[in-house]
Amino acid sequence: GHNNDSEGMVEEMKEFDTTLKILVDYVNKHPETLLVVTADHETGGTAVGYKGHAVGEQVPVHLTFSTKGHTGTVVPIFAYGAGAEKFAGIFKNWEIPGVIEGLMR
């Protein structure tokens, strides 16, 4: 993020992965539930270096940052569960609450 702390980012992603597994398990047990994951912006302009290694091969990763601020990079939106198909495509952030509201009707 703003500190350009690649080690911290990796640790946060591990924590996020653990949390996401718990949430997906919950959705699987409660099929009326929708899980939506997104961000309001990207920060840091993170780039991962490429050295031509095979997929699955463990190699050191070289992360670089273009800024300590926000970027204009499009952020993903992931949806899982009841109504997830409504999140196919590209959305402006302000459109997402309307999609969720429509699903709640």
Regions found by a protein language model. Name each.
Residues G1-R105:
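A post-motif C-terminal structural segment
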